[in-house]
Regions:
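Surface-exposed, low-hydrophobicity beta-strand/loop segments enriched in small/polar/acidic residues
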Residues: 1-148
Length: 148
């Protein structure tokens, strides 16, 4: 899912996860505690990165837990282009501002037309392509928090 030379993969300082991240490619995560990430389930979660390759823990079903055999890969460098998964809320268009869909609460993204951002919520970046609900689009990872 990562694209070309503009992408960057974290040299896995993240060594614990708070849930099964298998098949969560294109979803947003936030830093929950030191060296530990969790799916961003609402727009107030401070952006950490986008999952490129998901994984489970070494003890599936028990969380927090150490990352499993497969590596967890994320794009977390500002300005990188990454594919993200659009929520069930509706389609997005190129140039839409994307944020975590607080209704689906599963790390997927929606635009500000489908969910108006409130103070303290985060825009994660701009859509670079069009996509329908449940599809993927390209997004430039450029988080910005909404101020008063």
């Amino acid at each position: 899912m990562a694209l070309g030379a503009t992408t960057y993969k974290t040299p896995n300082i993240i060594n614990q996860i708070d849930e099964d991240l298998t098949a969560k490619e294109g979803c947003g995560v936030f830093l929950y505690a030191a060296n530990r990430v969790r799916l961003a389930t609402d727009a107030t979660a401070i952006p950490y990165g986008i999952i490129v390759t998901g994984t489970d823990s070494v003890t599936p079903g028990t969380y927090p837990s150490a990352i499993g055999d497969a590596s967890l890969e994320m794009v977390d460098q500002l300005g990188c282009v990454v594919q993200v998964l659009i929520s069930s809320a509706g389609s997005v268009a190129a140039n839409d501002t994307l944020l975590i869909d607080s209704t689906d609460a599963d790390g997927t993204f929606t635009n500000t037309t489908n969910q108006a951002p409130a103070v303290g919520e985060w825009a994660w970046g701009l859509a670079l392509t069009d996509a329908g609900a449940g599809e993927q689009c390209l997004m430039r990872f450029q988080p910005v928090g909404r101020q008063a």
